[in-house]
Amino acid sequence: MQKNSFKIYSFVNEFNLSDLHQLSKDICIIYRNYDNINHLENILKLKEYCKNIKTKFYLSNDIKLSIKLRLDGVYIPSFNNKVNYVQNYSLPKNFDIIGSAHNITEINLKLKQKCNEIFLSPVFKVNKSKEFLGVNRFNFMTLNKKAYFIALGGINEKNYKKIKLLR
């Protein structure tokens, strides 16, 4: 299930106002910081910033805190393989669950985790991986799946036009 519009996300690991001001106002922000355990101050600043510019804000891999702080949703990374990660919580209305996957097995897991949007990567060649999906494999893997898939990885000016070929 694909939509015809593009959504753009930016992953951030800290509240840096000068970096945030360089982003377009219609970019959704995902806070992902696995190094700093005490990051509540950053999260609260980012929440306020996103509220002021009217953009969506997601927290990575902490559904309990995402619900408690009334964020727009949660991002579940590919390494989170807990099938019942979401089922134990009463989700607020319009709470988005975004996942990340690299193959069919991970896609099916993210669907079981109730993800309504899934980053699928890498679509194009990237330095840190020998394998990439390509347009045809991306389209085949997302065929008849009930989620919105987001292309991630290796997108640049040379292959940007190929994005239009994705389902």
Where are these regions (language model features)?
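Conserved N-terminal beta1-alpha1 strand-loop-helix module at the mouth
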Residues: M1-N84, Y89-E117, K146-A147, I155-L165
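Short, small-residue-enriched loops and turns at beta-alpha junctions
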Residues: N36-I37, K125-K130
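Charged helix-capping and loop-helix junction motifs
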Residues: L44, E131-F140
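Generic, ordered loop/turn and secondary-structure boundary motif
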Residues: F124-K125, N156
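Flexible, gly/ser-rich surface segments that form the specificity/activation loops bordering the active-site cleft
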Residues: S121
